[in-house]
Curated annotation (Swiss-Prot):
Keywords assigned by UniProt, alphabetized: Cytoplasm, DNA damage, DNA repair, DNA replication, DNA-directed DNA polymerase, Nucleotidyltransferase, Transferase
UniProt-listed GO biological process terms: DNA repair; DNA replication
Matches recorded under Pfam families: DNA_pol3_alpha, DNA_pol3_finger, HHH_6, PHP, tRNA_anti-codon
Enzyme Commission numbers on file: 2.7.7.7
Assembly: DNA polymerase III contains a core (composed of alpha, epsilon and theta chains) that associates with a tau subunit. This core dimerizes to form the PolIII' complex. PolIII' associates with the gamma complex (composed of gamma, delta, delta', psi and chi chains) and with the beta chain to form the complete DNA polymerase III complex.
Biased composition (Acidic residues): 446-458
Record lineage: Bacteria, Thermotogati, Deinococcota, Deinococci, Deinococcales
Name of the protein in its database record: DNA polymerase III subunit alpha
Catalytic activity line of the entry: DNA(n) + a 2'-deoxyribonucleoside 5'-triphosphate = DNA(n+1) + diphosphate
Protein localization: Cytoplasm
Role description: DNA polymerase III is a complex, multichain enzyme responsible for most of the replicative DNA synthesis in bacteria as well as the bulk of DNA synthesis/repair after ionizing radiation (IR). The alpha chain is the catalytic subunit. Following severe irradiation (7 kGy of gamma irradiation) genomic DNA is fragmented. DNA is progressively degraded for the first 1.5 hours after IR, in a step promoted by RecA and counterbalanced by DNA Pol I and Pol III, followed by massive DNA synthesis and genome reassembly in the next hour.
Annotated GO CC locations: cytoplasm
UniProt source species: Deinococcus radiodurans (strain ATCC 13939 / DSM 20539 / JCM 16871 / CCUG 27074 / LMG 4051 / NBRC 15346 / NCIMB 9279 / VKM B-1422 / R1)
Region called Disordered, residue ranges: 442-461
Length: 1335
């Protein structure tokens, strides 16, 4: 039958109208959010869908991912931007029946299986019901998949269009089982539920099951009057993507393409077909035009408008506040009350009563009367302080209303303006003198220090002006916040922060640009005075840029969940959720995944992966790397299989790989979240998580809060506890860390030495070295250092250091800014003429070019985005504005260029200042209370044995004693005993938390344990099994009772004695002993003294077994030569590698010393052998790999618990280092290597005269040892070998005693080590003869 002879198809649509022929839209399409199943990236998919849309038809596309709606908002936004109509849906997992979603038993037959059902939102109510269905699938029905059942469909079917589904649907599966009557009954159930919104879905991918089922479905459609719809179950974009999709499925199932039994699609037809291809699959001669035309009509019916973009309405949560006030007024009340506490010397009662009185006068009689009526008639003179704050809040509302009515951008405050004018003219109110006198008698609340011996008029005037400046800043910020509609946000954040503080949960001083707000400081959201640190409010909230404020809040990471719990309890668990985040297939990992499933040799792909550049911490895309790296181009040109893998990886790169929970983001809704977004369960199965990512929840209007966990706050809390329990004077002198002095000499000395292990932000070897070179003298230096030590601005560190030390002057004339230097000098003074902060860009634009600070913030953002048209406009504004201030056009352009270049890496000063304070606090603690500092540090890191080992090593350098656990002295965690640190019982492996608590409880109740037998009799097997008892002995916890080997061998005796004692006690309790007039006593047997004590190495070995690290010593201490021969310690290896400036994809030789542990040997695919092992020194440990080329050579020396020197090749890998073992040098071999004298000289602090003295000392104590001099400046170093050997032990001692800027020590000649033992000539030997640039 030809097309023209085909019968007119039955068209059944909800509104009964007919479709136009020759139309088609894809309504069953999976995207990248069908995780590791959909290989269609949203933008590629929408672009192609638009291309295959029949001419004259509005492009439309449905998104129907498996079980979730993760990508709905992104899909909607991209589609609207690309002029494609978005249809939001999802393919639900259905278990038939009512309440069956809660059934967790495995499927026994088809009815208990999980089936597919295609659902589309017809309107916003339908969208909401999809959110509810998908959510409840996760929260109530999750069992392998997020499942819904017929009960949920009955509850939430309104506004939804449903299709009968693919081969995985209930109807089709029943047909495939030969149960035609059941399939028909199921079809009718759905038809009755959805009515005219139900369609029979027809697909044909050439599969035999479809050929069998489709005629039956067609017959039922015609018989029952149910419309048919043609779909293609798309999983990728184009037919050519089928193999890439097959590869993706293999990655998901961890299979290889060579595995014939792997899960795969049956054909390559699951792509976005054009109408012609669809009609070839479903010929019009057989199906008519109905299945195609219906797709277009359904697309017309689906009209969901999401509240995004300009239609977005913020869903601010409802916070209970006192009756009779608006949210804006409540914020004002809290701000005034808080500001008075923050600035008691300036924002005084007298000032505020004067301000209120003047404001009432400015209002006029009628309006003033109305305001006073709201306060119960109390005026500014008669009201109490709380009512005064309320009065000021009501007055603020009046001025804001007047400002809006007049169309003012910023609220005018006439009374404040007159007070400022009086202050400038010299007219001072009476209270100003009293306030200034009172301020002299108390600690300053600002950086302004008043001289108690002076009482002149000018000082009083300055004091009063500053008070007015504070009041002006508060009023300005309040007007901006309230006019932008965000008072609720500030109050909500302040509520949970103050709850945390009131419950002794540490909160950070601020983070991000929010620290620039005085209102936030007043209501205790932040703890940083923005005026003292010269922070800009406009960097945070800008009336020229309407966007939600965003406070990032740090909490003690151990108690962060308590704060989230408080918010859930306050607003309701159904209104609070964390936010999803999605991991994508990044370039390097994606290439390796594809290569694995294709069976490519790992080494080959690994080599390409390592050539992919990393910029600012982010890898290039595969396309960028291919264009930028000639070596990659060459390797792909020479290897067809590698090229194929690379191109498949390019197709898969960027696809969504997995969903997880965002580290900080929490949303709080005004109403139940599922009215707006779908949710799912977190990994614990308790809390709920939005299915959308952070950008999507913000786009749709939900309010996002950031609850960040900061380990350093846990550390500071732990330190406070230890300081208190160890009897220090800390609390008496300072109260807490917010009140320590910022001018402590010992703290700056510590940072100047680079002794910053464990100090927040200064922990790494690189930044510790930068701190040593900078030698900070003030908090501003610490703030700048953390901002500078990042890719990009790091290149300015040498200049900053030179200017800081007075070696180099700032010269704006020489730099080309003679006419703008009057402003630059002021703005860049604290950073020595170097732009470091984003706020400085804003200040320069404001001062030099006349921008408002709001406009300057827009300039800063434009520079960051590099929009060519916007930059052209901004340049013109800047140059013209600067010209009006007397800056020539060429200088204005040059200044604009400097700011533009800096904008790429400028740092947020508010964030840097807040974190700089925490840096200082931790450094101050280390400098002033080192024992407590280290005990707290070890406690918070106790679960990371590598970190504990590193810090124990640092403690030894500080001459602190870290002792093994002691059963009678140790607490649960690390504790201070005098000037020593005791290991906690929690650190002992095999000893559970409950056992530790029982031990401490027994010790508290019945006193110290007297012996091993006493411990066993009091606690015995009920609390500690034999393995736990052995761990206690091996850790050293029972050292007070005897030698460890003797204790181990006597354990059985002690357990038997304990059992005997228990039996005697039982008889005593029953009264049997007393019946015979006798009292039994079980005598404890002594330790087996005939057992030989452990050797030092044996003792250290069992100590490490029990604690995960060596405490009472280290095996390397007996082999000092090994440590001298190493390039660096294990924990410093990353920093050492960075200093070598190794090119991407290249390797660097190094020499490491340590104990060989955990050797694992295994065969390779090529038939050889390889090994992996751990190398551990006092600072930590790392894994090494020995490939087959080195294996035979080093295998005899791969013996566990053996000290050795290992020559390795290092290469950068995925943000870390991989170490490949090339050779192992034994102790005996090392004894043949001569030692050298190595002297590091700091040229910054060594004067030319002192260098002459150095030569004299060297001559006086000269020996014959080869000698190397390493001469250092802040930006580079050079190593020289002296022509004649002059080193000697005496010279080393004399040089170190005489010159603070010289560090002389013995070392092995690494040239000799590498030349003699390395399998090939080392690449780094030439560096000894030349200079090396610092990273």
């Amino acid at each position: 039958m030809t097309v023209s002879d085909a019968p007119t198809p039955h068209i059944h649509l909800p509104d009964g109208s007919c479709c136009q022929p020759k139309k088609f839209a894809h309504l069953h399409q999976h995207t990248q959010y069908s995780l590791l199943d959909g290989a269609a990236k949203l933008k590629d998919l929408l672009k192609w869908a638009k291309e295959v849309t029949p001419e004259g038809q509005t492009p439309a596309l449905a998104m129907t991912d498996h079980g979730n709606m993760h990508g709905a908002v992104h899909f909607y936004n991209y589609a609207m931007g690309m002029e494609v109509k978005p249809i939001i849906g999802y393919e639900a997992y259905v278990v038939p029946g009512f309440g069956t979603r809660r059934d967790r038993s495995r499927a026994q037959d088809g009815e208990k299986g999980i089936f597919h059902l295609t659902l589309l939102a017809r309107d916003f109510e339908g969208y909401q019901n999809l959110c509810r269905l998908s959510s409840r699938g996760y929260t109530e029905g999750y069992y392998y998949k997020p499942r819904i059942d017929h009960e949920l469909l009955q509850e939430h079917h309104k506004g939804i269009i449903a299709f009968s589904g693919c081969l995985g649907s209930e109807v089709q599966q029943l047909l495939m089982q030969g149960r035609e009557d059941d399939a028909r009954a199921r079809l009718l159930w759905y038809r009755e539920l959805f009515g005219d919104n139900y369609f029979i879905e027809i697909q044909d991918h050439g599969l035999p099951e479809q050929k069998k089922n489709n005629p039956i479905l067609k017959a039922w459609a015609q018989e029952l009057g149910i419309g048919m719809v043609a779909t293609n179950d798309g999983h990728y974009v184009k037919k050519s993507d089928a193999t890439a999709h097959e590869t993706l499925l293999a990655i998901q199932t961890k299979a290889t393409l060579a595995d014939e039994n792997r899960f795969k699609f049956p054909c390559d037809e699951f792509y976005v077909k054009n109408l012609e291809e669809m009609q070839r699959a479903l010929p019009v001669s057989e199906w008519g035009e109905e299945p195609f035309d219906n797709t277009a009509h359904i697309a017309e019916l689906c009209n969901v408008e999401l509240p995004v973009g300009k239609k977005r309405q913020y869903q601010m949560p409802q916070l209970p506040i006192p009756e009779g006030r608006s949210m804006a007024e409540e914020l004002r009340v809290q701000t005034y009350a808080g500001a008075v506490k923050r600035y008691p010397a300036h924002l005084t009662e007298g000032l505020l009563r004067d301000y209120a009185a003047r404001s009432l006068a400015e209002l006029g009689e009628a309006d003033a009367a109305r305001v006073l009526k709201r306060t119960g008639g109390c005026d500014s003179a008669s009201c109490d302080l709380d009512t005064l704050y309320t009065l000021l809040a009501f007055l603020g509302s009046e001025w804001e209303a007047r400002g809006k009515e007049a169309g003012e951008k910023y609220t005018p405050y006439p009374a404040l303006e007159k007070m400022e004018q009086d202050g400038e003219s010299g007219t001072l109110p009476a209270y100003a003198h009293a306030d200034c006198r009172a301020a002299r008698r108390q600690d300053s609340d600002t950086s302004i220090e008043l001289d108690p011996d002076t009482d002149d008029e000018e000082t009083t005037r300055s004091h009063h002006r500053y008070a007015l400046k504070l009041l002006r800043r508060a009023e300005y910020e309040l007007s901006v916040i309230n006019n932008m509609g965000f008072p609720d946000y500030f109050l909500i954040v302040a509520d949970y922060i103050n709850w945390a503080k009131d419950h002794d949960i540490s909160v950070g001083p601020g983070r991000g640009s929010g620290a620039g707000s005085l209102v936030a400081y007043a209501i205790r959201i932040t703890n940083l005075d923005p005026l003292e640190f010269e922070l800009l409010f406009e960097r945070f909230l800008n009336p020229d840029r309407i966007s939600m404020p965003d406070f990032d809040i740090d909490f003690n990471d151990a108690r962060r969940t308590e704060v989230i719990g408080y918010v859930q309890e306050k607003y309701g668990t159904d209104k609070v959720a964390q936010i999803a985040t999605f991991g994508t297939m990044a370039s390097k990992a994606c290439l390796k995944d594809v290569a694995r499933v294709m069976g490519l040799e790992y080494a080959k792909v690994d080599k390409v992966s390592k050539l992919i550049p990393i910029k600012f911490g982010k890898s290039y895309s595969l396309e960028q790397a291919r264009e930028a790296v000639p070596d990659i181009q060459q390797m792909l040109a020479e290897d067809a299989q590698l090229l194929e893998a690379y191109e498949f990886a390019q197709k898969l790169e960027g696809l969504t790989r997995h969903a997880s929970v965002h580290a900080a983001g929490v949303v709080i809704g005004r109403e139940e979240l599922t009215n707006l977004v779908p949710v799912m369960r977190d990994t614990s199965g308790e809390g709920q998580v939005c299915q959308y990512d952070m950008k999507s929840v913000e786009d749709i209007g939900l309010i996002k809060m950031d609850f960040l966990g900061l380990r350093t706050l846990s550390f500071l809390d732990e330190a406070k506890r230890i300081l208190r329990e160890s009897g220090t004077d800390f609390e008496e002198k300072y109260g807490d860390f917010d009140h320590i002095p910022f001018d402590d000499e010992k703290t700056y000395e510590l940072m100047s030495r680079g002794d910053t292990k464990g100090v927040f932000q200064l922990e790494g070897a690189g930044i510790a070295d930068a701190s040593r070179r900078l030698k900070p003298r003030r908090l501003a230096d610490i703030i700048a250092l953390s901002a500078l030590y990042r890719p990009g601005p790091m290149e300015n560190i040498p200049t900053y250091v030179r200017r800081h030390h007075g070696i180099e002057e700032v010269d704006y004339d020489k730099d080309g800014f003679p006419n703008s230097k009057q402003w630059l000098e002021k703005i860049l003074q604290e950073t020595y003429g170097i732009p470091v902060y984003q706020e400085q860009i804003m200040q320069i634009a404001s001062e030099v070019a006349g921008y408002s600070l709001g406009g300057a913030d827009l300039l800063r953002r434009a520079m960051g985005k590099k929009d060519a048209e916007e930059m052209k406009r901004q340049r013109q504004l800047f140059v013209v504005g600067a010209k009006e201030k007397g800056v020539p056009e060429d200088e204005g352009n040059k200044l604009f260029d400097m700011l533009d270049a800096f904008a790429n890496y400028g740092f947020n000063k508010s964030h840097s200042a807040a974190y700089g304070v925490i840096t200082y606090q931790t450094a101050w603690l280390k400098a002033n209370y080192p024992v407590q500092f280290m005990a707290a540090l070890l406690t918070v890191e106790r679960r990371d044995s590598d970190k504990v080992a590193e810090y124990v090593s640092d403690a030894r350098k500080m001459d602190l004693h870290v002792l093994p656990p002691d059963i009678n002295r140790s607490s649960s965690d690390f504790a201070v005993a005098g000037e020593e640190i005791l290991f906690g019982l929690y650190a002992i492996k095999g000893l559970g938390e409950s056992a530790v608590l029982r031990i401490l409880e027994e010790r508290e109740k019945a006193g110290a344990f007297k012996s091993l037998a006493d411990f066993c009799s009091r606690l015995g097997n009920k609390v500690c099994n034999r393995k736990a008892l052995e761990s206690l002995i091996k850790s050293g916890a029972f050292d007070a009772f005897g030698e460890r080997h003797q204790l181990i061998e006597s354990l059985e005796d002690a357990l038997e004695d304990a059992a005997g004692t228990a039996e005697i006690n039982a008889r005593a309790q029953s009264g049997m002993s007393m019946m015979f007039g006798m009292e039994e006593v079980k005598k404890e047997r002594p330790l087996r003294s005939s057992i030989a004590p452990y050797s030092d190495l044996e003792r250290l070995a069992i100590e490490k077994e029990a604690l995960g690290l060596y405490i009472s010593g280290h095996p390397l201490e007996q082999h000092e030569g090994l440590r001298e021969a190493a390039s660096c310690r294990v924990s410093d290896l990353d920093a050492w590698f960075a200093l070598q400036n190794v090119a991407p994809g290249k390797r660097q030789k190094a020499v490491l010393a340590g104990m060989i542990e955990g050797v694992v040997k295994k065969p390779t695919k090529s038939g050889g052998m390889m090994a992996r092992f751990i190398l551990a020194d006092e600072s930590g440990q790392m894994e090494l790999v020995a490939f087959s080329r080195a294996y035979d050579r080093i295998e005899p020396k791969l013996v566990n618990d053996t000290p050795a020197l290992v020559i390795v090749e290092l290469e950068a890998e995925d943000g870390g280092l991989r170490a490949i073992a090339e050779e192992i040098v034994s102790i005996e071999q090392l004894s043949e290597v001569p030692k050298v004298m190595y002297v590091t000289i700091d040229l910054e602090t060594a004067s030319p005269d002192a260098l002459g003295d150095f030569q004299s000392v060297l001559d006086e104590y000269a020996g014959s040892m080869p000698t190397y001099l390493r001469l250092e400046t802040p930006e580079q170093f050079v190593v020289y070998q002296l022509d004649h050997g002059m080193g000697s032990p005496e010279a080393i001692r004399a040089l170190n005693q005489t010159f603070a800027w010289a560090d002389a020590h013995l070392a092995y000649d690494q040239q000799t080590i590498l030349g003699r033992f390395a399998p090939k000539p080392p690449a780094w030997m030439n560096r000894q003869q030349g200079g090396g640039m610092r990273a």
